[in-house]
C-alpha cells in the first residue's frame, strides 16, 4: 500500500518560511513554502530535485489569511447553506479525517501500521 507523511507548520513566524507543507512518500517528497510560493519536488528514483516559484492569483492574495483558504472555505460553506452550491466537505469527510488522526496516534504509540478497517471504516 501507499504510505506518506505530511507535516504542516503554519506558525513559523520566526523562520524563513511562514507556512511550510511537506509530504513524503515512497516516490519522493514535495514541499510548499509560503510566502515565497516555492514548490520543490524530489524524486527517489533519480535523486533529482526541482524547485519552481508558483504565481498566485491576486484574488487569492487579496483574500489574506492562509492564502485565502479561510475566506474561500467560508464562502463555499455559505453558498451550500443557501442552497446555491453543493456541499464540498461532508460529515463523512470529517469522520474520516478524525479517523486518520486516531490511526496516526495508534501507529505512533504502537509502532505499527493501522488500517481504516480497524477503526470501522
Regions found by a protein language model. Name each.
Residues 1-37, 68-84, 102, 120-121:
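Contiguous beta-strand/loop segments that form the cofactor/metal-binding neighborhood of enzyme cores
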Residues 8, 62-63, 79, 89:
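Residue-level detector of alpha-helix boundaries and kinks
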Residues 27, 44, 113-116:
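Generic secondary-structure boundary/loop-capping signal
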Residues 31, 36-55:
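Mobile, glycine-enriched helix-loop/loop "lid" segments at the mouths of ligand-binding/catalytic clefts
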Residues 54-60, 85:
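Short glycine/proline-rich turn/loop motifs
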Residues 60-68:
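A short glycine-threonine-serine/GTX helix/turn-capping micro-motif
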Residues 76-121:
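C-terminal helix-rich "cap/oligomerization" subdomain common to oxidoreductases
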Amino acid at each position: 500500500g501507499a504510505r506518506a507523511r505530511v507535516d504542516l507548520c503554519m506558525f513559523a513566524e520566526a523562520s524563513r518560511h511562514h507556512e511550510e507543507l511537506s509530504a513524503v512518500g515512497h516516490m519522493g517528497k514535495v514541499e510548499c513554502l509560503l510566502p515565497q510560493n516555492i514548490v520543490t519536488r524530489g524524486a527517489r528514483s533519480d535523486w533529482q530535485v526541482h524547485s519552481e516559484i508558483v504565481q498566485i492569483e491576486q484574488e487569492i492574495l487579496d483574500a489574506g489569511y492562509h492564502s485565502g483558504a479561510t475566506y474561500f472555505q467560508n464562502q463555499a460553506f455559505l453558498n451550500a447553506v443557501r442552497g446555491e452550491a453543493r456541499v464540498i466537505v461532508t460529515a463523512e469527510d470529517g469522520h474520516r479525517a478524525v479517523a486518520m488522526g486516531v490511526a496516526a496516534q495508534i501507529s505512533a504509540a504502537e509502532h505499527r501500521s493501522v488500517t481504516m478497517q480497524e477503526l470501522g471504516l
